[in-house]
Structures are given as C-alpha cells and as structure tokens.
C-alpha cells in the first residue's frame, strides 16, 4: 500500500528515496520504558486488584516490576543513541514515510495479532513495532489514511519528521490528505 502512494509524494514536490533508519535496540528499550511506566502508574493496581486486571495489563506491569535501576539506565542510554542516529538520518531526509502497522486491521473478536506472515509475535504488542520504534526515537509523527485493502479495510502511513518539526509534519500530512482525499472516505466495511 505504501508503494502505491509514492507518486502522491512525488506530485507534492518531494524527492522520494528508499532508506532504512537504524532502529537497533528500539524494541528492547521501548519495552523497558513501557514496563517501567506501567509499574509506576499501575503497580498498586496489580498488587491490590490483580483479579480485576486483563492478562495483558498484568503482563505489562510485571515487565516493569522485573526491572532494575541498571535496566532503566541502559534503556535511557540506548534511547539517546537511537535519538542521535535518527537525528543523523533526518539530517539527510526531511521526512520518513512508513507503515502505521505491520498488517491491516483485524477482526474485533481477535484480542491482538499473534502472527504476521508466518512469524509468531513475541508478545501482545509486537505487531505494533512499526509505531513504537518511531515513538522510541522521540521524533514527531502523524498517522494519516492512505487507502483501503481489497477487503475495504483502512490502511495508513506514518509521516515522521525532524526533531521538533511538528509543524512540518502537520503541513505534509495536510498536503497528503488534500491530495488523496482518503480522510473523507468511509471504509466500505462500515457502510
């Protein structure tokens, strides 16, 4: 789906190149920060109301309970390295356009995606890596609609910008939305 939108960015005056930022350690550092935050904000809930929590929330909080100070320190050091690598990447490219998620929307009865293209996901949030890798970089991003699957399910792209260039990200998102009009479309599955 992303490739089919390339011409839109060309039409908007962008020079479009294939490029891969280095997301080394993004997965592990994000999971540490997420677990740490969950434990800080929901640790009392786990201790006092465990029987009322969903298994996914328990898993999230327990990831934070297991952490040590050195774990969080490591994650912070790696986050800064990731931030610097992304800054270097963004010095060469003004924007990064990437998928919002690694797969199209799934059935509402399914709690989370456990497998993508035959690859088993390590945990219940692994299918969202394309989003949380960007989050871990600390760079501004926005998700905008870019079309529909053959089944009529909505698909989006992320527009990622340079650090502190939220305005540039919003401008490109607006231009892309105006050029495509997908934001006005009601997914066929909803009609």
Model-derived segments and spans:
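Conserved acidic residues
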Residues: 94-96
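Short, surface-exposed loop/helix-turn segments at secondary-structure junctions
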Residues: 74, 106-127
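Tryptophan-centric aromatic hotspots in well-structured domains and transmembrane helices
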Residues: 23, 30, 59, 83, ...
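Short helix-loop capping/hinge segments that flank enzyme active sites or metal/cofactor-binding pockets
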Residues: 17, 34-87, 99, 103, ...
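Short low-complexity, flexible loop/linker segments enriched in glycine and/or proline
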Residues: 30-35, 113-114, 157-159
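Structural helix-boundary/capping segments
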Residues: 3-12, 67, 72-76, 84, ...
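Gly/Ser-rich, acidic/histidine-flanked active-site/gating loops
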Residues: 1-32, 65-66, 71
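Conserved beta-strand edge residues that scaffold enzyme active sites
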Residues: 22-24, 103-104, 148, 190
């Amino acid at each position: 789906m992303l490739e089919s939108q390339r011409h839109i960015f060309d039409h908007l005056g962008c020079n479009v190149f294939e490029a891969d930022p280095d997301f080394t350690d993004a997965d592990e550092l994000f999971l540490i920060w997420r677990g740490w935050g969950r434990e800080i904000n929901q640790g009392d809930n786990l201790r006092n109301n465990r029987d009322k929590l969903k298994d996914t929330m328990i898993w999230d909080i327990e990831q934070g309970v297991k952490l040590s100070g050195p774990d969080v320190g490591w994650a912070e050091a790696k986050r800064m390295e990731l931030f610097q690598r992304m800054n270097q990447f963004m010095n060469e490219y003004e924007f990064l356009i990437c998928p919002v998620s690694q797969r199209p929307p799934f059935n509402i009865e399914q709690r989370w995606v456990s497998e993508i293209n035959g690859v088993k996901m390590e945990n219940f949030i692994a299918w969202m890596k394309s989003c949380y890798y960007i989050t871990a970089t600390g760079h501004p991003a926005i998700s905008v609609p870019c079309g529909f699957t053959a089944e009529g399910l909505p698909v989006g792209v992320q527009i990622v910008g340079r650090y502190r260039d939220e305005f540039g990200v919003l401008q490109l998102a607006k231009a892309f939305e105006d050029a495509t009009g997908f934001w006005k479309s009601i997914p066929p599955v909803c009609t």
